[in-house]
């Protein structure tokens, strides 16, 4: 059985027209049929079936079903599940097992979600195509010669291919939203601090945020509401109360909605069909009573440069812990301590991770700190001011999720700067920490998905998802 929304599935489960065990077995069978696509790194066959049987027993005995009762979910392999592997798609963590659950995982499990396995990703969440993985590339479910996006490409492909009803990813600069756009699904990055990062392997700590990938806005918001909230294990998690997202979404009306459309998002380098599809969808909302407001965000050209200075600096610090001494991969060429450190990291990390560590170390060095890192922090503050000012005048900022549709596997691997541009529209929301979502709005002439990207003010996830629901391609 494969249903398009969790509410449909829940209705079938609660009425006992179908069992959790049957649902889970169906998903596991499909996962097995797609095993050559590298979508999952680890599949929890026994654990998922055992959990499903417990849920069936709970229901038969009159127990109260949780809010996610029987929802089959996938978890990106940089999020901790106790006793399961935690590879981050890297050789350096190939044999490591988590010793605790991430807070997000604990909260989902407490509401009766069923975890099917851990999904493939770009190594340490560094990439936009899911090609930077020690476990191989993941194909796009719509065209297996093309990428699913990254770094949460495995999670996006799992949902799009019907191998999970929803999935968790992590989003540092677009790693949930960009693959969602490439895979014709919804990808939500909440406000920084809305979801605890406890149990998420750090890439860039002031940017990282756990996000949700789902087939529709209702499912994504439901999962968000369960994970959101203060966590004593994460000092950066917000104390703000978690609202009723369903009620907030229902309150959103198209008539009178002010949609900010930055002129910088629709430049000559934007793929023609992507621009046409996004504009057409915006015009549909205008015809229903929304107001399209032209806005300008002149600093947009500096987003990618500032972002890659800041995140590589944080990555060079965060990844220093992987040295072969405490856990993970240790080189056999370890004649002394220094050789162990150098060879373990050289052999354990992939090309893109090493590139970013070196770049981060460079921008933090004494001679270049003020020139690069300090200046990028100043640019970040300017971005925060500009986006706050813009969102005082409009309800939401809208544009394409990516400047181009899914590209061919291998097409951009030798040109990192071109690869980085895949995130040019998603990076600003990460720089400022505001909530953002990619919602599917159409298909181009080659039947490749096109997503629209929306940004709202801090902690306005309900409003954001309500607007997205009006845009979502049926």
Curated annotation (Swiss-Prot):
Domain of life (superkingdom): Bacteria
Pfam families cross-referenced by the UniProt entry: Amidase
PROSITE patterns (alphabetical): AMIDASES
Subunit field text: Heterotrimer of A, B and C subunits.
Active site residues according to the UniProt entry: 76 (charge relay system), 151 (charge relay system), 175 (acyl-ester intermediate)
Enzyme Commission number, as recorded: 6.3.5.7
Cellular component GO terms held in the UniProt record: glutamyl-tRNA(Gln) amidotransferase complex
Keywords: ATP-binding, Ligase, Nucleotide-binding, Protein biosynthesis
Catalytic activity as recorded in UniProt: L-glutamyl-tRNA(Gln) + L-glutamine + ATP + H2O = L-glutaminyl-tRNA(Gln) + L-glutamate + ADP + phosphate + H(+)
Protein name: Glutamyl-tRNA(Gln) amidotransferase subunit A
UniProt organism field: Chlorobium limicola (strain DSM 245 / NBRC 103803 / 6330)
GO BP terms in the entry: translation
UniProt cross-references to NCBIfam families, sorted A to Z: gatA (TIGR00132)
Function: Allows the formation of correctly charged Gln-tRNA(Gln) through the transamidation of misacylated Glu-tRNA(Gln) in organisms which lack glutaminyl-tRNA synthetase. The reaction takes place in the presence of glutamine and ATP through an activated gamma-phospho-Glu-tRNA(Gln).
Sample GO molecular function, one term: ATP binding
Family from the record: Belongs to the amidase family. GatA subfamily.
């Amino acid at each position: 059985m494969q249903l398009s929304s969790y509410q449909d599935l829940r209705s079938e489960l609660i009425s006992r027209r179908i069992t959790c065990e049957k649902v889970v077995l169906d998903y596991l069978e499909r996962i097995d049929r797609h095993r050559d696509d590298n979508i999952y790194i680890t599949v929890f066959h026994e654990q998922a079936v055992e959990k499903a049987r417990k849920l069936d027993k709970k229901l038969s005995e009159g127990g109260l079903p949780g809010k996610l009762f029987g929802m089959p979910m996938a978890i990106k392999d940089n999020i901790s599940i106790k006793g399961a592997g935690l590879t981050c798609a890297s050789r350096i963590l190939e044999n490591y097992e988590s010793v605790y659950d991430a807070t997000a995982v604990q909260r989902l499990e407490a509401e009766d979600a069923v975890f099917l396995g851990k999904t493939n990703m770009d190594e340490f969440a560094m990439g936009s195509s899911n090609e930077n993985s020690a476990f191989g590339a993941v194909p796009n479910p719509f065209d297996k010669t093309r990428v699913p996006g990254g770094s949460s490409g495995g999670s996006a492909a799992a949902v799009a291919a019907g191998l999970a009803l929803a999935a968790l990813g992590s989003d540092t600069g677009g790693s949930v939203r960009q693959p969602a756009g490439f895979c014709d699904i919804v990808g939500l990055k909440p406000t920084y601090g809305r979801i605890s990062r406890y149990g998420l392997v750090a890439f860039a700590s002031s940017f990282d945020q756990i996000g949700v990938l789902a087939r529709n806005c209702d499912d994504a918001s439901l999962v968000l509401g369960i994970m959101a909230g203060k966590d004593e294990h994460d000092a950066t998690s917000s104390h703000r109360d978690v609202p009723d997202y369903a009620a907030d979404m229902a309150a959103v009306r198209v008539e009178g909605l002010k949609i900010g459309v930055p002129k910088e998002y629709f430049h000559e380098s934007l793929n023609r069909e992507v621009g046409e599809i996004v504009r057409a969808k915006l015009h549909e909302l205008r015809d229903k009573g929304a107001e399209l407001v032209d806005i300008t965000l002149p600093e947009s050209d500096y987003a990618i440069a500032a972002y890659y200075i800041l995140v590589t600096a944080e990555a060079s610090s965060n990844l220093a812990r992987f040295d072969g001494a405490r856990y993970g991969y240790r080189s056999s060429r370890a004649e002394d301590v220094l050789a162990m450190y150098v060879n373990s990291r050289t052999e354990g990390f992939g090309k893109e991770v090493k590139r970013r560590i070196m770049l981060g170390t460079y921008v933090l060095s004494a001679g270049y700190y003020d020139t690069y890192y300090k200046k990028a922090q100043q640019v970040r503050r300017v971005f925060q001011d500009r986006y706050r000012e813009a969102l005082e005048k409009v309800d939401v900022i809208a544009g394409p999720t990516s400047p181009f549709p899914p590209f061919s596997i291998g097409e951009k691997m030798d040109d990192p700067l071109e690869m980085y541009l895949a995130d040019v529209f998603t990076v600003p929301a990460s720089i400022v920490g505001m909530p953002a979502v990619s919602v599917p709005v159409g298909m181009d002439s080659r039947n490749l998905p096109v997503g629209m990207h929306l940004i709202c003010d801090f902690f306005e996830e309900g409003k954001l998802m309500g607007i997205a629901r009006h845009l979502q391609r049926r």
